């Protein structure tokens, strides 16, 4: 058996070598286009080997590397090649993302050419018909994107297979027994790929880490942590550096700072928050509001180029998974000297804004300060004061109540002004997963976005805008939060789609104003099609990112925007704090400007990439726990709303934010047809219909933790 396998692999290697030789021959500067008969003569191909040459030529054509003329002559392809990153689909096809291309390039399964998920590939793009998605062929793999993969191990007698958690990987991995590290069936393992395989051969790898058994508490989330390569522990060098950081603010630390310790100010956070990096204050100056947004001066303790700083940049952001937080900075810092704890002297960077009744910032000051918060407030208690008018809570915080009432007044003014200019508010309910001590979900519910959370959101937004505008006009190197305008093609598609529901978008000069999208979302609010149109509107927009150019934030309809308010958990905020402080201290000379100009593009790119990674990991843990939660409710009945309809079924969203699929194959009472113009499934005999926004009772049929999917069946 082993000898036969060796012969097969030897033949494959010979074939690939001959294919390379033929292609190299055609790439020679002296080569002239030839017919197959001429190629046989020049290359000395025997009559019995001609079928193999024909197959080689067919393969090279399929890969887009050579072309066949109308006269039957072969030559090297002159089609322009493009480089991008391949995103695989479990059904074999995929997409290549090319920088500068508004849409991904579709790669049919037959033209994937051995590429795997996240590989950097070279492609040729096929001629495209107007209005259709671009298609291409993968010519070669330039660099493998995945070196290690998290898998479930399946042991056999003399070998094992590792089944990747990421179904996009497309195949399981052969593990020789001597490279299994003693893993047993059911173990979650990290596999390092040693060979990516060739035609007819699976990839091979070795187990480098056993995470734990699939049934052990915490193994599921830890597997996601490993899959996204999220750094968890801090090195001894970093922790030693942290131990040397002062635990208290000294008089020397306060020197040269504005002393605001006698100002009335509070932090407002969730009950569980320990890293309190923002405080707010408010007083009236005549008819004007003086709003202070006071941010922990983390840069005072994280010095540029230190081991701690290098690690913070590498992480880019804190990651908030359902059962744990993976912090950007060690907790000794983020929960200690950098946390604006009640009654403690703390160093801060404050943005103090004078705002008139129209919501206009008519004056502002950005300063290094020393502060002391009066109370550590929670969103719950501030809501009880402002919305619920809870007498007991109002009495407990009676000295702060007048300030909270003025804050609510100002927040409403700021929100109204933002909405007037066209700011878009996607009010999708976020999910809160409640876990027991072993990490199992015991409840899932929508996150409560109330008057208190919105108040803090409004204040942070105006501070971020004010700081960004200040530094834009000073022409100082900076990191901005940018949200580019949507591509005109995507907006055109959205416009065509919403016409089916009687809505229109006013598009001028090939672009849309954010106010148009805001109006659309307001029109669909409360309608059956709200969920679908809101999601499609979101998908038509670009992702926000960090840049060194200030080109505005489309979603907020803001000309200037940055992230200034969360330096404990976001590196861009920490980075601009350093810039602001150097500028305040008069040290922003030509050398320092050149320094920042040389590093900020890389900082912005790293921060954008780590943010994407964190968001994906966070989403995966929520989806995983939703599956686990619903697996404990198999056979139970729930009422939900149809949130999406396709030709293969419809999606139902429950009040707790869980979404599942009712497959059309499970609608056994009739034959159902899909009507794309109205997004309905209709029974051909009964005319029974399933449409967007329709309330429906469903039974939980099955869940798949690997695929992160939930299937429902109609209860009736």
Residue ranges and their predicted role:
Residues 2-292, 299-345, 383-384, 679-681, ...:
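Charge-lined substrate channels and their catalytic hotspots, especially those that engage the 3′ end
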Residues 41, 195-196, 223-226, 230, ...:
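Electropositive polyanion-binding surfaces
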């Amino acid at each position: 058996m082993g000898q036969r396998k060796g012969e097969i692999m030897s033949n494959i290697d010979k074939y690939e070598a001959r294919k390379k030789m033929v292609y190299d021959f055609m790439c020679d500067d002296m080569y002239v286009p030839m017919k197959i008969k001429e190629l046989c003569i020049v290359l000395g191909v025997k009559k019995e080997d001609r079928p193999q040459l024909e197959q080689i030529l067919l393969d090279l054509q399929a890969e887009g590397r050579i072309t066949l003329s109308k006269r039957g002559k072969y030559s090297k392809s002159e089609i322009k090649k493009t480089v991008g990153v391949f995103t695989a689909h479990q059904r074999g096809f995929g997409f290549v993302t090319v920088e500068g291309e508004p849409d991904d390039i579709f790669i049919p399964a037959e033209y994937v050419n051995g590429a795997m998920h996240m590989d950097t590939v070279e492609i040729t793009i096929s001629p495209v018909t107007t209005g259709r998605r671009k298609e291409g062929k993968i010519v070669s793999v330039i660099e493998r994107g995945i070196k290690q993969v998290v898998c479930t191990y399946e042991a056999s007698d003399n070998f094992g297979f590792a089944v990747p958690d990421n179904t996009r990987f497309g195949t399981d991995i052969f593990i020789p027994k001597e490279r299994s590290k003693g893993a047993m069936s059911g173990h979650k393992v990290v596999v390092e790929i040693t060979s990516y395989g060739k035609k007819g051969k699976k990839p091979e790898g070795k187990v480098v880490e056993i995470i734990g058994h699939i049934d052990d508490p915490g193994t599921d989330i830890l597997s996601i942590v490993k899959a996204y390569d999220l750094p968890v522990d801090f090195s001894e060098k970093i922790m030693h550096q942290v131990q040397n950081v002062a635990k208290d603010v000294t008089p020397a630390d306060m020197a040269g700072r504005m002393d605001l310790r006698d100002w009335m100010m509070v932090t407002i956070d969730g009950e569980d928050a320990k890293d309190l990096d923002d405080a707010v204050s408010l007083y009236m100056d005549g008819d004007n509001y003086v709003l202070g947004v006071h941010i922990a001066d983390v840069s005072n303790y994280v010095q540029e180029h230190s081991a701690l700083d290098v690690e913070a940049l590498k992480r880019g952001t804190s990651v908030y998974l359902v059962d744990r937080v993976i912090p950007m900075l060690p907790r000794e810092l983020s929960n200690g000297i950098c946390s604006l704890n009640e009654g403690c002297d703390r160093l801060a960077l404050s943005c103090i804004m004078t705002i008139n009744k129209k919501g206009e910032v008519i004056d502002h000051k950005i300063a290094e300060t020393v502060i002391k918060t009066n109370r550590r407030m929670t969103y719950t208690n501030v809501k009880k004061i402002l919305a619920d008018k809870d007498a007991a809570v109002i009495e407990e915080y009676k000295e702060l109540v007048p300030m909270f009432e003025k804050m609510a007044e100002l927040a409403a003014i700021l929100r109204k002004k933002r909405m007037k200019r066209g700011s878009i508010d996607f009010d999708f309910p976020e999910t809160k997963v409640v876990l027991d001590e072993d990490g199992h979900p015991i409840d899932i519910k929508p996150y409560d976005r109330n008057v208190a959370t919105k108040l803090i959101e409004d204040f942070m937004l105006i501070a971020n805008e004010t700081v960004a505008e200040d530094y834009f006009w000073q022409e100082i190197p900076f990191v901005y939060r940018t949200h580019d305008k949507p591509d005109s093609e995507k907006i055109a598609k959205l416009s065509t789609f919403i016409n089916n529901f009687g809505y229109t978008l006013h598009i001028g000069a090939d672009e849309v104003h954010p106010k148009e999208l805001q109006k659309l979302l307001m029109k669909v609010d409360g309608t059956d099609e709200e969920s679908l149109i809101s999601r499609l509107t979101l998908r038509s927009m670009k992702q926000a990112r960090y840049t060194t150019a200030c080109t505005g934030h489309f979603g907020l309809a803001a000309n200037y925007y940055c992230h200034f308010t969360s330096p404990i958990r976001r590196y861009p905020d920490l980075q601009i704090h350093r810039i602001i402080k150097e500028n305040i201290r008069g040290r922003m000379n030509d050398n320092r400007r050149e320094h920042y100009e040389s590093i900020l593009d890389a900082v912005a790119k790293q921060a954008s990439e780590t943010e994407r990674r964190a968001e994906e990991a966070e989403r995966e843990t929520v989806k995983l726990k939703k599956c686990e939660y619903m697996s404990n409710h198999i056979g139970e009945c729930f009422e939900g709303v149809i949130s999406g309809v396709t030709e293969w079924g419809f999606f139902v969203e429950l009040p707790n934010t869980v979404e599942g699929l009712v497959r059309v194959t499970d609608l056994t009472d009739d034959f159902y047809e899909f009507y794309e113009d109205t997004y309905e499934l209709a029974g051909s005999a009964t005319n029974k219909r399933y449409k967007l926004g329709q309330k429906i009772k469903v039974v939980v049929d099955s869940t798949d933790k690997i695929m992160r999917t939930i299937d429902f069946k109609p209860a009736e």
